[in-house]
Design a protein with these regions (language model features):
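Glycine/proline-rich loop-helix segments at beta-alpha junctions forming the active-site rim
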Residues: 1-12, 17-20, 90-140
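A structural signal for short, well-ordered beta-strand segments and their strand-loop junctions
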Residues: 26-27, 65, 85-88, 125-129
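Short, surface-exposed acidic-centric catalytic microdomains
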Residues: 36-103
């Protein structure tokens, strides 16, 4: 659902938080790229986003699929194998001029990161994949 006024559009997060039962790590981003930039319907799927390229290098892994449902399933399987969960800090936000950079996103509703941690008690580390302040990422 979205609502637009002037240069701002209200957007709700399009994806569910993904946290495998065995998750030891939780990657927390800000909000997905604008839907016009999706290569697949999952986190960090923007055409210009380098998250999955970095993951490939860090883990010496190569993803076979880079678009569509197979890319989503491949990444979920990979995250499960590495005990990594993934979410974003904004549940609903204003987006300025359809831009995807953090400085063009303004929170309306923040994700309750503490609830995720309460539900998944094995998570030992939070990895912030954003330039936004830590207090915003944790909903403080």
């Amino acid at each position: 659902m979205s609502w637009k006024k002037d240069n701002y559009e209200v957007e709700e997060h399009p994806f569910e938080t993904f946290v495998p039962l065995n998750a030891l790590f939780l990657v927390v981003g800000t909000f997905p790229t604008h839907k016009n930039n999706f290569r697949f319907k999952f986190f960090y799927s923007g055409k210009d986003n380098s998250f999955w390229n970095i993951i490939e290098k860090v883990f010496n892994h190569s993803f076979k699929y880079n678009d569509g449902d197979k890319a989503v399933e491949e990444r979920k399987t990979f995250l499960k194998s590495k005990a990594i969960g993934i979410t974003d800090m904004h549940e609903k936000c204003y987006r300025k001029n359809n831009y995807s950079t953090d400085e063009n996103l303004f929170p309306i509703i923040l994700k309750d990161i503490f609830s995720i941690l309460d539900e998944h008690t094995f998570i030992k580390r939070i990895i912030l994949a954003s330039r936004t302040e830590v207090s915003v990422a944790l909903g403080l």
